[in-house]
């Protein structure tokens, strides 16, 4: 079978074109660091990379959610730390108010002190975050949850929750009712078996009103005032216990968020390595292949050039 000069030319050109395409592809891989830039480069790896990319995006979203949750929980804990101090100060005032030898002026002075503590607690209960949203209003964050005059709660009834991992949703914002209008199951009961007061502001209002009432020379009013002070004292114990219970929960959540962050970081690192194995170049392999392909291409160029200069007259010399 005769092979024409044209056929030899076309075969050599085809070989050169293919070698050049492969060499340029290897060069592109070296410049980008990616072995797979198009699905056709490795359909299986490309498909797995798409799925893995979605998992990476989800992991990043949960990381952002945990950052937001940590900020919310930390802010609530900071405010409740101040609430704890204020309640403890109020308890000290109430214990002192139980002294039966106080004059009406002394009692009035204590009432003023308690009113200041109540105002402080009201401001804390109506605290806002950096965006002006009320942190103890549940999902009704645009309006103050507590009424300044009555201490009544008008915020949302549902706690704010946030999904912080694929299988974990947690409370990141308690309602004001859960903190300032609630007591625990082991609360100190009333001696007569009646329901214990739950509203912190009502407790303080009861004591303030009793301390403002003159009792000197009036045993009936003195007994009423003493009963009111005792009731407030029990109420403050219950309220403080409730706040401390919520704070313990917040501490547990902050610890869990930290653990989830560590797991998320480990997961992100594993996903990054897996993605690299799927689409990134093996530098030793690609550099070696690039050099070999370059040498082969140069040899093909030389062969083609030599063939172009060949003729029967040159062969017979």
Curated annotation (Swiss-Prot):
PANTHER family: FLAGELLAR HOOK-ASSOCIATED PROTEIN 3 (PTHR42792:SF1), FLAGELLIN (PTHR42792)
One cellular component (GO) term of this entry: extracellular region
InterPro entries, per the entry: Flagell_FlgL, Flagellin, Flagellin_N
Biological process according to GO: bacterial-type flagellum-dependent cell motility
Protein origin, superkingdom: Bacteria
Pfam families xref list: Flagellin_N (PF00669)
Protein name: Flagellar hook-associated protein 3
Family membership: Belongs to the bacterial flagellin family.
Keywords: Bacterial flagellum, Secreted
NCBIfam families attached to this UniProt entry: flagell_flgL
Cystines in this chain: none
Example of a GO MF term: structural molecule activity
